[in-house]
Amino acid sequence: MKTIDELLSEGVAGKRVFVRADLNVPLDGTTITDDGRIRAVVPTVKALADAGARVIVASHLGRPKGAPDPAFSLAPAAARLGELLGADVAFAEDTVGSSAEAVVTGLADGGVAVIENLRFNAGETSKDDAERAAFADKLAGLADVYVGDGFGAVHRKHASVFDLPKRLPHYAGYLIATEVGVLKKLTDEVKRPYVVALGGAKVSDKLAVIDQLLGKADRLLIGGGMAYTFLKAKGYEVGISLLQEDQIPAVKEYIERAEKNGVELVLPVDVLVAPEFPDLKTKAPANPTTVAADAIPADQEGLDIGPETRKLYASKLADAGTVFWNGPMGVFEHPDYAEGTKAVAQALVDAPGFTVVGGGDSAAAVRTLGFDENAFGHISTGGGASLEYLEGKTLPGLAALED
């Protein structure tokens, strides 16, 4: 995989460089609530602009239905990128139409432009190879060189991620190079004990990665909504907690395999429960009760790991040589249910080894809860991409950059 440093050494002054970034940031109206993904692409964009390239930044945002939708415009992200660069960033109101052509034509050496949401074109996400290829051909007409730096999208077989690099000289940006280096530390160069903490709502989202980790990790800590399917598989009643009944047979098999492989599978010993899900808008006090994990009342749902579990998980992380954490331990968006996630984050900060926060909700939680991002070994920008890499899958966006 050729990297941006090789491109810079070849010289990029005056060249149109298409940077496939991941500017898929959460929005409240037009206000960006977490700009982590925009900040992550700044080193690549700045290096190219400083070297005199004409930089065209492209990304998706949300899931528009293959047509323009103002709610998913990249305009706020373009404005924020300009603020972070301390430079004017031009914005094209389409992706491959007259606005994009005019904006790209008008770029001076060292200039930066953002084109509108790639998913406003059905060809970006099409399952039809010919439709995707046709859109990639149009994108290729805008640029001379391709730099892949949207790690959060490399697991998608989309036109700008998979088809476009085949049409232009292609290089990995700083973010992708860093992310791949980190994931190699989690797969090929693991320092032990290797501890994995998994949370989040659905156990079905994590089954494939658990399958792989049962042969690699030393300890697996389970929290979040997915923990209740594990507790049910152990024969406990879980009240009205989130439960994926159809996954219980698979989870039972994983519990048995963990025992057979000598992997320590650690489940909550106590949880915070309440009769209903909290109001995340008003953040009104939820007044949860702490109960043992095997004594959840029939009319209550578990919404965070309890104080004993927090201590237990911290102790299991205390000597870790390598840690991968993906998914919050509870409904961290509400202050009454944030302590479990906070405890795991703090345990990662305190752990002596290399710690990775695996993107998505965990990365958002770390920022929301006020942790210093530099206190972790690495905070990934790709939740789904990280998981699929650890599952051993070939990621289309990385495969395209390898060719």
UniProtKB/Swiss-Prot annotation:
Q: Which GO terms describe its biological process?
A: gluconeogenesis; glycolytic process
What is this enzyme's catalytic activity, as reactions?
Answer: (2R)-3-phosphoglycerate + ATP = (2R)-3-phospho-glyceroyl phosphate + ADP
Which keywords does this Swiss-Prot/TrEMBL entry list?
A: ATP-binding, Cytoplasm, Glycolysis, Kinase, Nucleotide-binding, Transferase
Gene Ontology cellular-component terms for this entry are: cytosol
- EC number(s) per UniProt? 2.7.2.3
In this record, what's one Pfam family?
PGK
Q: What is its main location?
A: cytoplasm
Name the top EC class: transferase
Task: Give the pathway.
Answer: Carbohydrate degradation; glycolysis; pyruvate from D-glyceraldehyde 3-phosphate: step 2/5
Query: Which PROSITE patterns does this chain map to?
Result: PGLYCERATE_KINASE
The entry describes its oligomerization and partners as: Monomer.
Q: Which family does it belong to?
A: Belongs to the phosphoglycerate kinase family.
Q: What is this protein called?
A: Phosphoglycerate kinase
Q: Which organism is it from?
A: Streptomyces coelicolor (strain ATCC BAA-471 / A3(2) / M145)
Lineage runs: Bacteria, Bacillati, Actinomycetota, Actinomycetes, Kitasatosporales
The gene is: pgk
